[in-house]
């Protein structure tokens, strides 16, 4: 069945669905796909005029399995394996995600960084990530001569990389065969005796025994309509772009400083930059139009030039017309892991949000897990991403997921 993405008219608004997904970004579209594969009739609601037009398009569109925790590694490996065989897995032979796998390179400039990277890689290999490599600074510069002379060690995995998030979103949507309503906002929930009975929208009501909040930085506000409190904080994050420059190595991997978190990757003849620590960013109310700080490109360029000095040369010859800067919102949780599973307050209401900047890379595995939870193929009490984990006092003190 062909996917139908449209603004609904009163006469074609469905009376009921097995599942309503609130949010038409990459996570919502992936949720629709896996739920449809589980046999559910799905309706997706997106209040904006098109899918994937908010946080999905403000990302660096990257993916990696190089985390430190086995749970995170397993999740991202599953997503990456899906991306690598996307057309085959979702039933769209030849579908192009613009998949690039030049790798992810984590570097350290600390004198004792070699031991820290070795421990990091050992933990990753113990978690099943056997193809991550540990390099000395010399080995890293032999592979990538543009690295700083004081880079003391590095970790590299070739199968990490990036893709086109717009194509990923629409691929999931198309493969789902489900109905997607744009310009349609969820404004409330119908419940009775603690159970979900339907979703109230700006264009009509739909009866449904199940719904998923996949609304990114708006997830907290949407869940609150049902009396559910989510520990999700919208926090501003920037990305800067350079349209083109002859000094940018086009074969560079995504390169990340283990000390600062500053990172860059090539994009055609140009590049993208990110750096979560450029500014102190308090939580804010979710909004579609997030103002960018014009100082970010200069700060990010300086940060990446510390481990890749050619960026200093780029900065010397760069024209302002060749630089872009945008801002969006991360949906941060206390432990920087997503909330995937039952709401715990309203039976039939589920959450797939809080990816904390990793929504593109985690979308496939997270949505697959949620679909399995909804239909009973997985148990909520053994789900590591369940909302109830924050009821444990130890969770409040847990440090955020490392790079």
Task: Write out the residue ranges for each language-model feature.
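Helical element adjacent to the flavin cofactor pocket in flavoenzyme catalytic cores
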Residues: 155-209
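N-terminal Rossmann-like FAD-binding beta1-loop-alpha1 element of flavoenzymes
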Residues: 17-43
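Extreme N-terminal leader/targeting segments of oxidoreductases
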Residues: 1-19, 37-38, 400
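Dinucleotide-binding Rossmann-like beta1-alpha1 core, especially the glycine-rich loop
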Residues: 60-143, 261-263
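Active-site lid/adjacent beta-loop-alpha segment flanking the redox-cofactor pocket in flavoenzymes
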Residues: 244-348
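C-terminal catalytic lobe of FAD-dependent flavoproteins
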Residues: 305-403
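Glycine-rich FAD pyrophosphate-binding loop
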Residues: 36-56
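Central helical "cap/lid" subdomain
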Residues: 52, 205-253
């Amino acid at each position: 069945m062909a996917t139908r993405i449209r603004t609904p008219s009163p006469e074609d608004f469905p009376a009921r669905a097995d599942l309503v997904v609130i949010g038409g970004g990459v996570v919502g579209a992936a949720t629709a796909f896996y739920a449809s594969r589980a046999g559910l009739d799905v309706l997706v609601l997106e209040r904006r005029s098109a899918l994937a037009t908010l946080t999905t398009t403000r990302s660096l569109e990257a993916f990696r399995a190089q985390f430190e925790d086995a749970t995170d590694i397993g999740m991202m490996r599953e997503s990456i394996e899906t991306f690598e065989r996307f057309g085959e897995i979702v039933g769209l032979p030849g579908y192009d995600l613009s998949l690039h796998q030049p790798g992810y390179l984590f570097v350290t400039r600390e004198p004792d960084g070699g031991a820290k990277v070795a421990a990091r890689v050992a933990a990753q290999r113990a978690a099943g990530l056997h193809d991550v490599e540990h390099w000395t600074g010399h080995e890293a510069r032999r592979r990538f001569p543009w690295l700083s002379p004081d880079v003391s060690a590095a970790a590299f995995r070739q199968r990490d990389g990036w893709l086109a998030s717009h194509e990923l979103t629409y691929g999931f949507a198309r493969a789902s065969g489900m109905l997607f309503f744009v310009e349609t906002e969820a404004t409330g929930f119908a419940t009775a005796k603690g159970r979900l009975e339907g979703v109230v929208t700006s264009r009509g009501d739909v009866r449904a025994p199940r719904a998923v909040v996949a609304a990114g930085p708006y997830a907290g506000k949407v869940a609150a309509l049902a009396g559910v409190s989510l520990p999700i904080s919208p926090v501003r994050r920037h990305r800067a772009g350079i349209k083109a420059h002859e000094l940018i190595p086009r074969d560079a991997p995504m390169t990340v400083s283990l000390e600062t978190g500053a990172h860059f990757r090539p994009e055609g003849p140009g590049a993208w930059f990110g750096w979560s620590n450029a500014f102190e960013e308090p939580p804010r109310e979710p909004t579609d139009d997030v103002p960018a700080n014009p100082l970010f490109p200069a700060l990010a360029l300086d940060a990446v030039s510390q481990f890749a000095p050619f960026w200093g040369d780029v900065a010397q010859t760069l024209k302002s017309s060749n630089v872009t800067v945008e801002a969006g919102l991360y949906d941060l949780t206390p432990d920087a892991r997503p909330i995937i599973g039952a709401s715990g307050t309203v039976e039939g209401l589920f959450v797939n949000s809080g990816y904390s900047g990793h929504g593109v890379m985690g979308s496939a595995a997270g949505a697959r897990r949620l679909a399995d939870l909804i239909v009973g193929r997985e148990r909520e009490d053994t789900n590591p991403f369940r909302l109830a984990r924050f009821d444990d006092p130890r969770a409040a003190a847990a440090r955020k997921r490392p790079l």
